[in-house]
UniProtKB/Swiss-Prot annotation:
Binding residue positions for substrate: D21, F22, N23, R36, H59, C60, G61, R62, R118, R151
Name of protein: Phosphoglycerate kinase
Lineage, highest ranks first: Bacteria, Pseudomonadati, Pseudomonadota, Alphaproteobacteria, Hyphomicrobiales
GO CC annotation: cytosol
UniProt keyword list: ATP-binding, Cytoplasm, Glycolysis, Kinase, Nucleotide-binding, Transferase
Family: Belongs to the phosphoglycerate kinase family.
Enzyme Commission numbers on file: 2.7.2.3
Protein's GO biological process: gluconeogenesis; glycolytic process
InterPro entries per the UniProt record, alphabetical: Phosphoglycerate_kinase, Phosphoglycerate_kinase_CS, Phosphoglycerate_kinase_N, Phosphoglycerate_kinase_sf
Principal subcellular localization: cytoplasm
Subcellular location: Cytoplasm
Length: 397
């Protein structure tokens, strides 16, 4: 994948519209988590040092095309100033005369944050006139937000038809890391897919069996794969209406010479709650009243042995109900094993998705993986093999 970056453009004195993702959690008008802001530091500091006039575009929350004060980006200003060690001006709108006046006042190296682009319905509709109003205040455009690049929105895709467009450093780093995962990986490649439902990851599973050497299935979706092979799963979460679909995925994996790895033993609980009574069972012995809530000890050993032989690991989704101890043990054990191999340079590990990030933080290994994507929907669509609208616009002709 070849795309245009900041190395390909002179930004001195240029009005640079930068699409960032400042969709951060807030409480009582204060930012609660700075993680997403920090991810943009490299791009913003570089542009500032190179003498660009920075105009930042972002959404926050889901205001549905109207002004909702609780979704204002104003609280971001003071936090961002500390992160980039630079004053940040704020415009109470993202288009119109107020913004134009603020942009005209910018000097080289200045930073201006515009108000939430989703206060206008034209943003999510990818309206060309709204995209034009955004583009009016810039000479060129930089996308630094992989997490929104699956959205064909005005500030992500529409604007790229109107201005020369480039990838920022955060986006560039993410794309290069993901390329190591599935684009041009070192083999053998293992994908570990967990989570509750097969239905939410059908496209992911169908794509992965074509791309990886081993596909490990965990979490609630493993129950559907077990059931499709005639294994009784008791009261476990299971999508019985998808049995034929699951069988087709199993068949496709065989045709693509992709090894499918399912649990061989499981932790069964008898109530769906923290510290519920539980026992370890082989998959052929699951009691009628039981629910599969985690993978068992032999399954952990099997998965870790597959990871030992892998050069690349792509992970999305927990292996059990990790938010309810003690049913987090499987996820923690495998995560720590993968992290240890990553730290010693024996494994390239790429992980992403909201629950996955939470699970790896819970296991205290999030910083030990080769790359951890905080993008949710964008990461899943990448795993499906889709070319994201916001990325397509940056690719070299």
């Amino acid at each position: 994948m070849v795309f245009r970056t900041l190395d390909d453009v002179d930004v001195l004195g240029k009005r640079v519209l930068v699409r960032v993702d400042f969709n951060v959690p807030m409480a009582l008008g204060k930012v609660c988590d700075e993680t997403r802001l920090v991810r943009h530091k490299e791009t913003l500091v570089e542009l500032q040092k190179r003498g660009a006039k920075l105009i930042l575009l972002s959404h926050c929350g889901r205001p549905k095309g109207k002004i909702e004060p609780e979704f204002s980006l104003r609280p971001v200003v003071s936090v961002l100033e500390k992160i980039i060690n630079q004053p940040v001006a704020f415009a109470p709108d993202c288009i119109g005369s107020t913004v134009q006046v603020a942009v005209e006042a910018l000097q080289n190296g200045d930073v201006l944050l515009l108000e939430n682009v989703r206060f206008y319905a034209g943003e999510e509709k990818n309206d060309c006139s709204f995209a034009g109003a955004l583009a009016h205040n810039g000479d060129l455009y930089v996308n630094d937000a992989f997490s929104v690049s699956h959205r064909a929105h005005a500030s992500v895709e529409g604007i790229t038809r109107l201005l020369p467009s480039y990838a920022g450093r955060s986006l560039q780093g993410e794309l290069q890391a993901l390329e190591k995962g599935l684009g041009n990986p070192t083999r053998p490649v293992v994908a570990l897919v967990g989570g509750a439902k097969v239905s939410s990851k059908l496209f992911v599973l169908n794509h992965l069996v074509e791309k990886v050497d081993t596909l490990v299935i965990g979490g609630g979706m493993a129950n559907s794969f077990l059931a499709a092979q005639g294994i009784h799963v008791g009261k476990s979460l299971c999508e019985h209406t998808l049995m034929e679909t699951v069988k087709k995925i199993i068949k496709k994996a065989q045709e693509c010479h992709c090894t499918l790895l399912l649990p061989v033993d499981v932790v069964v609980g008898f109530r769906f709650e923290k510290d519920a009574p539980h026992r370890l069972y082989d998959i052929g012995d699951i009691p009628e009243e039981g629910m599969i809530l985690d993978i068992g000890t032999r399954s952990i050993v099997h998965i870790n042995s597959v990871i030992d032989k892998a050069a690349t690991l792509v992970w999305n989704g927990p292996l059990g109900v990790f938010e309810m101890p003690p049913f987090d043990k499987g996820t923690i054990a495998v995560a720590r094993h993968a992290a240890e191999r990553s730290l010693t340079g024996r494994l390239v590990s790429i992980a992403g998705g909201g629950d996955t990030v939470f699970a790896l933080n819970h296991a205290d290994v999030a910083n030990d993986f080769t790359y951890l994507s905080t993008a949710g929907g964008a990461f899943l669509e990448w795993m499906e093999g889709k070319v994201l609208p916001g990325i397509l616009a940056l690719m070299q002709p």
